[in-house]
């Protein structure tokens, strides 16, 4: 397949009168640009091993005839200008010895294409340093790109160097001597072009790396600034929250101070009330010891009146000092004191607790007080029972005398009872004496029972019935009753 392709290329070259296999140097093609910059021919530096197949197809591209003619015309002293016949014979001999060598040589020489690159002073400076490296790299790459296409034939053997050509042809030596500086200059341009392209690529890569680094640096600086701004905002917010907390704490402390002042004012008013209450208690206790039967009720009422008057005085004097919190506290204290006083009066807790050594003396006093209280209660009970018995006796007497008693006397008795009940209700303590004058009918009834004197003694000591009997048997009966009325509350 390769042989057929090479033969086809050779045939087309012969028909088009194009020679692509014997070019050692390239003509200086002057590009027509507006800018006065200088250009040089550069050999392409191919280092990619994976693009071998592509390069194989690109090798067989034809060079335009007009471009080739221009290059040949400009290069008047071409080394192969006078030795076309020799080159033809050499090519024929090589093709006869190895049919595939012709295609390989053509393929190798067709890779050399003119490239125009602008020259700068920097590239001229770096030219001597990169000559050796580029030359060695180009030769190695050319030999290693297509190892299967050599087939044991050395390309250097097939291509003649200028020295060997000069030895075979004396005319060529003279022409070569005149063209040596130009060829040397062209080869230097071709070698340094690849290094220049590499330097350009490296400079572009370095510049790209620097740009990326600078961009990342700018991004990091922006991130740091943003973090710093956030920290400042948080610090300001924290400071504001601390100020708000401090203000609230101060307000709370002020409220606590106000409440404590109000409580202290109400507490300072309480001892006066307690002192007055203790003095009232002592007075009530002494009065209860002196007058065990009647006076305790009066003293308790007097104490309550005194307490209420003191409370009113305290309220009147402390209206300006009291606040909205002290008023309910004062009310609770008053109610508590009143309840406590009532309980102490009912349970005999007037005296404070005493040590153990004085318990016997206090117990004797308590016994005397308790005896007096119990005697007072028993007197009340007996008085009430005596009134009931008296009423029963009156009812029996009235039932016996109602037969002969006129209606007017019965009405008078009822009126007397009503008046007596009204008097009992009006007075707290009252001794009631009732005189009953019996009519003639009652006298006759009692005369029938003459000769018999009766003194009725009730169980109670506060009710006595006195009956007077005359010696003659003709006497009137006067019943005087002394009754102690119940307490009206």
UniProtKB/Swiss-Prot annotation:
Q: Where in this chain does the entry annotate a coiled-coil region?
A: 210-266
Biased composition, class Acidic residues, residue ranges: 468-477
**Comp. bias (Low complexity):** 182-197
- Name the residue ranges with Basic residues bias: 447-460
Mainly resides where? cytoplasm
Composition bias (Basic and acidic residues) maps to 73-89
Name the residue ranges with Polar residues bias.
19-35, 90-103, 128-147, 156-167, 263-281, 396-411
Pfam families xref list: TDA11 (PF17084)
Q: Which GO terms describe its cellular component?
A: cytoplasm
| Keyword set, alphabetical order | Coiled coil, Cytoplasm
Localization: Cytoplasm
User: Which region ranges are annotated with the description Disordered?
Assistant: 1-199, 263-321, 344-370, 391-413, 439-477
Family label = Belongs to the TDA11 family.
Question: Which named protein is this?
Answer: Topoisomerase I damage affected protein 11
Specify the species: Candida glabrata (strain ATCC 2001 / BCRC 20586 / JCM 3761 / NBRC 0622 / NRRL Y-65 / CBS 138)
């Amino acid at each position: 397949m390769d042989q057929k392709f090479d033969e086809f290329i050779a045939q087309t070259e012969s028909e088009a009168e194009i020679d692509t296999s014997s070019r050692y140097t390239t003509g200086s093609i002057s590009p027509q640009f507006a800018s006065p910059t200088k250009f040089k021919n550069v050999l392409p530096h191919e280092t990619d091993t994976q693009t071998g197949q592509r390069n194989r197809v690109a090798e067989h591209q034809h060079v335009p005839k007009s471009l080739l003619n221009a290059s040949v015309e400009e290069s008047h002293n071409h080394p192969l200008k006078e030795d076309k016949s020799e080159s033809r014979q050499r090519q024929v001999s090589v093709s006869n010895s190895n049919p595939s060598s012709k295609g390989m040589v053509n393929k190798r020489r067709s890779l050399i294409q003119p490239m125009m690159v602008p020259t700068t002073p920097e590239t001229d400076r770096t030219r001597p340093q990169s000559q050796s490296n580029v030359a060695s790299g180009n030769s190695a790459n050319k030999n290693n790109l297509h190892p299967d296409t050599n087939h044991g034939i050395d390309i250097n053997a097939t291509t003649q160097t200028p020295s060997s050509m000069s030895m075979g042809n004396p005319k060529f030596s003279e022409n070569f001597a005149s063209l040596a500086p130009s060829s040397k200059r062209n080869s230097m341009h071709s070698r340094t072009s690849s290094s220049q392209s590499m330097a350009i690529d490296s400079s572009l890569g370095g510049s790209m790396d620097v740009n990326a680094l600078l961009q990342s640096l700018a991004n990091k600086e922006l991130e740091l600034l943003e973090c710093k701004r956030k920290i400042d905002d948080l610090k300001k917010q924290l400071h504001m929250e601390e100020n708000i907390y401090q203000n609230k704490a101060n307000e709370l402390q002020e409220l606590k101070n106000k409440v404590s002042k109000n409580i202290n004012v109400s507490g300072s008013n309480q001892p006066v009330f307690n002192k007055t209450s203790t003095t009232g208690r002592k007075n009530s206790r002494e009065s209860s010891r002196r007058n065990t039967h009647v006076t305790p009720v009066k003293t308790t009422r007097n104490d309550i009146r005194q307490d209420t008057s003191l409370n009113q005085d305290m309220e009147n004097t402390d209206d300006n000092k009291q606040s909205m919190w002290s008023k309910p506290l004062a009310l609770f204290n008053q109610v508590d004191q009143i309840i406590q006083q009532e309980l102490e009066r009912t349970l005999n807790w007037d005296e404070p607790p005493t040590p153990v050594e004085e318990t016997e003396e206090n117990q004797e006093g308590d016994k005397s007080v308790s005896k007096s209280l119990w005697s007072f209660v028993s007197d009340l009970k007996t008085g009430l029972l005596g009134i009931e018995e008296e009423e029963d006796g009156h009812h029996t007497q009235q039932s016996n005398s109602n037969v002969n008693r006129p209606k007017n006397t019965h009405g008078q008795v009822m009126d007397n009872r009503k008046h007596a009940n009204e008097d009992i209700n009006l007075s707290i303590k009252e001794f009631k004496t009732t005189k009953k004058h019996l009519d003639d009918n009652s006298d006759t009834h009692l005369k029938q029972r003459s000769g018999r004197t009766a003194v009725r003694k009730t169980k109670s000591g506060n009710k006595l019935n006195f009956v007077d009997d005359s010696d003659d048997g003709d006497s009137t009966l006067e019943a005087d009753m002394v009754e102690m009325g119940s307490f009206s509350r």
